[in-house]
Amino acid sequence: MMKNAPTPTLPRCAGEGADSALCKIPARAGRARSLSRFSGGGLGRGLFALATLLAATPAHAYLAYVSNEKGNSITIIDTETLQAIKTVKVGRRPRGVELTKDGSELFICAGDDDSIQVLDTRTLQITGKLPSGPDPELMALSPDGKTVYVSNENDNLVTMIDAQTKRQIGDVPVGVEPEGMAVSPDGNILVNTSETTNMAHLIDTRTKQIIANILVDARPRFAQFKADGSELWVSSEVGGTIAVIDPVKHVVKQKISFEIPGLSKEAIQPIGISFTKDGKRAFVALGPANRVAAIDAETKKVEKYLLVGQRVWHLAFTPDEKYLLTANGVSNDVSVIDTASLKVVKSIPVGSFPWGVVVAPQ
């Protein structure tokens, strides 16, 4: 584990001492929410100001939530201004983050607290927690938004949770060190990757039974379906490859590898994967290679390697797919990729060791 890098100082965007030059966002009429119960005292004024700021974001802007693994915090980024507007303290070692379908709640895997915290995205207060096993790491939400699936790294289980009642509705034993989670577009197949077993486990969400165990390369960390469900991609961090899996035949039909001049194979470690909605292009975070690979998802050829921050972990598109955001663990920042030009257009300082990122839906 690498030592902590110093946490950058972010502009203060609410309460006394707010830096309006850095944090001003154009107002949009009719969206400010009443938070009168917070109106008393300095804390109340700060929360009210921040909530009004978030609610006033233009219709074409989105909010990104970045988990800072060593900072024990969530940094909020406005994707219109491309600035961090707030950092909120949460549980210990936050990694996986997932938004509810309406964007009203953020679920946070606080691994060292053995819990999944629930953050109200309007008040920015922790309002409760979801049941989980020890050291929850990553989550996936069913397409209808009703079920949360969680990998618990230390007990080799996948937990299933009702997103509305916040109650556990099942669990499935999987391989050793479960991490990556994905759900098929029709909601029928859940995928978990187990880092030590080196497998992708395909689970029928109706019967809660494993229907296939697919061997992949060493240390699989992430899984993602294409939007049409025709392919499942699994990244293997130590193996240095992407396994392209036929989710119907349950076979690896192709592997994608990476070559970057001047870097050893060992330095190229695929982690996060994001597909465009049309399924034509994929982006893969390459960890300590400090690159994101843009891949033609039809030919499986790398189109371009984009230099981002240090130790890139996970990725998230803005809903309009104008930008792709990357969480860069060692450089403590988020890189912003313009998806049309395939260029990095900005680096945004966040908290200590950013790991996960998710963007609020429209």
What spans do the regions from the language model cover?
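Glycine-rich adenosyl-binding loop in Rossmann-like folds that engage adenosine-containing cofactors
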Residues: 11, 36
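Glycine-biased, low-complexity coil/linker segments
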Residues: 15-16, 30, 40-41
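Predominantly soluble domains enriched in secretory-pathway, periplasmic, or organellar proteins
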Residues: 51-362
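Polybasic, lysine-rich low-complexity intrinsically disordered segments
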Residues: 3-4, 25
